[in-house]
């Protein structure tokens, strides 16, 4: 059975938003319910394309599927139509900092609440697909949250086969209000997968997501065949999100995916006209997994995410 439906969100003065999703119920027998979400950030096109491609594949092969897969390719439709990075343009809030949401809150909080209630709850597993947004260079990685179900989340994240994997502690989460954190708090194994950068619809980034999705489906026995054991990733114990105190012109000095030592130069932030640049150095050894690729940075603007490795690169 293939069913198309909508998550209906009352946005108050902004009307009612309908977020489309499709549920494919397999014909090969019983199995778990996996939900795949994408487009939490509306300009991360590689991840959205991967969700669409996965859905097209599942539509063609329900007879091979054991269990249920729900796919929501674009949950942040206001950002998608407006081509807006990072936030819901109706309120300027980051949807992936708004979960589990609030039915009486702002637009982002209402969308997050509806997605939590209609898509996350009731799932056995959740995968949230992302990519580097419009001004964001990115090294492919997965991350999951510390929780009572983290071992299951870790096993699925490993099956996704990306080169870096971050475990985020539940004590002082760097990323709060995310889909995967909300799922973990509900006891649902979940992880976030990142592939693609700068809002570019690159085929290799899409295929990297699809390779991981297919392997997780086999790992969960939703699809026939043995899951592939990929080369172990570089594992990271949390990360440091580095920001600039002042607005200015950001010039990175490192590339994503490269190991840096404590004290290494990561980049500089300079005044638009004249003045000495401010050096940005690594507070600890780590690997930049994403870097703001735009030279324009606001005060308190995010520069990069430095992940702390716990095994050898």
Predicted regions mapped to residue ranges:
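Structured catalytic-domain cores with a bias toward divalent-metal coordination
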Residues: 1-313
């Amino acid at each position: 059975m293939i069913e198309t439906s909508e998550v209906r969100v009352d946005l108050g003065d902004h009307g009612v938003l309908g977020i489309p999703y499709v549920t494919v119920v397999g014909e090969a027998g019983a199995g778990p319910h996996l939900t795949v979400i994408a487009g939490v950030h509306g300009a991360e096109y590689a991840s959205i394309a991967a969700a669409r491609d996965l859905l097209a594949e599942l539509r063609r092969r329900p007879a091979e599927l054991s269990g249920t897969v729900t796919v929501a390719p674009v949950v942040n439709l206001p950002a998608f139509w407006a081509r807006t990075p990072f936030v819901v343009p109706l309120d300027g809030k980051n949807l992936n900092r708004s979960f589990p949401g609030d039915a009486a809150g702002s637009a982002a909080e209402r969308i997050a609440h509806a997605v939590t209630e209609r898509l996350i709850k009731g799932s056995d597993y959740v995968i949230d697909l992302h990519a580097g947004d419009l001004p964001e260079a990115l090294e492919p990685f997965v991350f999951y949250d510390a929780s009572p179900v983290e071992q299951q989340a870790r096993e699925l994240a490993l099956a996704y086969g990306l080169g870096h994997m971050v475990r985020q502690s539940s004590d002082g989460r760097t990323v709060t209000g995310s889909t995967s954190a909300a799922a973990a708090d509900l006891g649902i194994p979940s992880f976030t997968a990142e592939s693609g950068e700068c809002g570019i619809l690159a085929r290799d980034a899409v295929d990297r997501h699809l390779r991981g999705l297919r392997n997780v489906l086999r790992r969960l026995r939703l699809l026939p065949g043995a899951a592939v054991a990929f080369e172990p990733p570089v594992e990271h114990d949390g990360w440091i999100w580095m920001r600039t105190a002042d607005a200015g012109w950001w010039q990175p000095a490192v590339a994503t995916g490269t190991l840096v030592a404590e004290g290494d130069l990561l980049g500089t932030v300079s005044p638009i006209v004249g003045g000495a640049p401010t050096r940005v150095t690594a507070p600890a050894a780590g690997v930049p997994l994403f870097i703001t690729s735009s030279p324009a940075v606001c005060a308190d603007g995010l520069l990069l995410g430095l992940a702390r490795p716990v095994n050898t690169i």
